[in-house]
Amino acid sequence: MNELTTIRPSTPKDWETDQEVRWCPGCGDYAILKAVQRTMPEIGGTPENTVFVSGIGCSSRFPYYMETYGFHTIHGRAPAVATGVKLANPDLDVWIITGDGDALSIGGNHTMHLLRRNLNCQFLLFNNEIYGLTKGQYSPTSREGTRSPSTPFGSVDHPAKPCAFALGSGARFVARAIDVHKNLPSVLKAAHAHQGAAFVEIFQNCIVYNDDVFEPFTAKPNAQANQMWCTDGEPLLFAGGTKGLALDVENLTLKVIDVVDGDTSGVIVHNVRNRAIAHMLVEMPFGPFPMALGVLYDDPAPTFESAIVAQNKAAAEGKVADLQKLVAKGQTWMVDKQPHAI
């Protein structure tokens, strides 16, 4: 007689490996790792059905520290490997771990194609605005004026905007979070619940080469005034609910308005399915505006692997083709057996 075996739910400890975590003391990657390990049991994940894929960089050591299947691949190519993994076994839960340099420099083309194809996976981009592994060169997201070994007089490049890039590439889920913030697990859970490519930019502090670059909105004294956590169906408020975002109708842009006595009638209500709102949120400049955080866009569409599976199934169920007819199909001609005189 067969006995039923009760499957014990996993715990964060089940997702930890015996590997020594080799990041600099105080690196924001530690907080992200713990957040992911805490999140996995809450989403009902199982280590044997989960795959972490990374490229090259400090963040890309991530698969070594997750008790799952993993691929530490080559520079910028994590999306390509992840696509192969998902197509080989669509039932796997695939997570891509990358950084601003890995994803937006050498891997920019692969990132774009993964997002436009809408592969069902979670894409976590650790943005510290610097190359950490190669000792502090400026990255695609480094701000103008950033001094580094490769830009000793200050960078003259305009920085890439990861979330704007993702939306422009056709991503159907775009979110932002902070490495040490308590809301990071909830953002990760929302990304996992989305069916399709879920792009999450995580502001990650590099304590060695770019320390406190995000302090204007991450430091405790600045957080309330400069962070705006976006919740679907709720008004876009910040500064303790005393300010909000409204639409400047004349210029079709956003503007900041004061919220008096709790009156939010003029404030935009966040709608995660509204792509126009998402574009405005990721493009608004920090300083005059707060930093928009949380789920900015979430509008599912059919996934890449489901379309491939359906296409292959239809092809397999079709009539077997005649090879000779296929060879002779289209523009064909006979080659003269007799050589022509030159």
Cite the ranges covered by each PLM segment.
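Thiamine diphosphate
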Residues: 56-132, 185-186
